[in-house]
């Protein structure tokens, strides 16, 4: 029962991590306008994401534009776009592997095979968490580097957006959920002795006949 509860908790955490990763990848809030120096009061705020950039006016009106060229993006955003998509696909693959080995499904009958599939899904979720963490940390490093670079104009400096925090949360949930699934895998060596004991218990003991059960003609 404890193992089943840990599996359910692990899958719930990984699903929450996958949803956070999807929202982080879709929202255009990886980089936001930095309010420093003379730009404390501005008429518009710029949001930059993986797929589009948005400009929010002081009146509340927002205009978004999809990037025309992939090569025009900064290097960190190009890598983040590719790694985020790969991480989401890897997490989906891990979910399919888990469903094949879950205790509530009948895709695989043997308990050892189910345990191996659950362990594999946990490893896949951990890989997905690492793939999610890399672009988020890379983009955050680029933002902080440019923010403290005196050669970058204040109007071009950016701050950490909400998508980065969602990405960190997604990575943590995927790593934690995958780790729980890996810990629920039972050791296969404990099932061997019980298997042989059951085999020996099925054999019936031999019954010896008493002297009175033999035919009397053998003594004539």
Swiss-Prot record:
Recorded GO CC terms: apicolateral plasma membrane; bicellular tight junction; plasma membrane
InterPro entries hit by this protein: Claudin, Claudin6, Claudin_CS, PMP22/EMP/MP20/Claudin
Extracellular side: 29-81, 138-160
Topology relative to the membrane: Multi-pass membrane protein
Source organism superkingdom: Eukaryota
Topological region Cytoplasmic: 1-7, 103-116, 182-220
One biological process term in Gene Ontology: calcium-independent cell-cell adhesion via plasma membrane cell-adhesion molecules
Pfam families: PMP22_Claudin (PF00822)
First-listed, main subcellular location of the protein, grouped into a coarse class: other
Positions of the UniProt region annotated as Interactions with TJP1, TJP2 and TJP3: 219-220
Role, per record: Plays a major role in tight junction-specific obliteration of the intercellular space.
Annotated family: Belongs to the claudin family.
Assembly information from the UniProt record: Directly interacts with TJP1/ZO-1, TJP2/ZO-2 and TJP3/ZO-3. Interacts with CLDN1, CD81 and OCLN.
UniProt name for this protein: Claudin-6
Organism encoding this protein: Homo sapiens
Annotated gene: CLDN6
């Amino acid at each position: 029962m404890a193992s089943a509860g840990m599996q359910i908790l692990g899958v719930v955490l990984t699903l929450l991590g996958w949803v956070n990763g999807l929202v982080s990848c879709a929202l255009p809030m990886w980089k936001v306008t930095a309010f420093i120096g003379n730009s404390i009061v501005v008429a518009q705020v710029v949001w930059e994401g993986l797929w589009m950039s948005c400009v929010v006016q002081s009146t509340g009106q927002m205009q978004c534009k999809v990037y025309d060229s992939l090569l025009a993006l900064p290097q960190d955003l190009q890598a983040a776009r590719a790694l985020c998509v790969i991480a989401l696909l890897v997490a989906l693959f891990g979910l399919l592997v888990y469903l094949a080995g879950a205790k509530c499904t009948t895709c695989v009958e043997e308990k050892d095979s189910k345990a191996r599939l659950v362990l594999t899904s946990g490893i896949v979720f951990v890989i997905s968490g690492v793939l999610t963490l890399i672009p988020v940390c890379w983009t955050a490093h680029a933002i902080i580097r440019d923010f403290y670079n005196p050669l970058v104009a204040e109007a071009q400096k950016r701050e950490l957006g909400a998508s980065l925090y969602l990405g960190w949360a997604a990575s943590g949930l995927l790593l934690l959920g995958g780790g729980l699934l890996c810990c629920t895998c039972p050791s296969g060596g404990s099932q061997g002795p019980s298997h042989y004991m059951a085999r020996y218990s099925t054999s019936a003991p031999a019954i010896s006949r008493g002297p009175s059960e033999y035919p009397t003609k053998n003594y004539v």
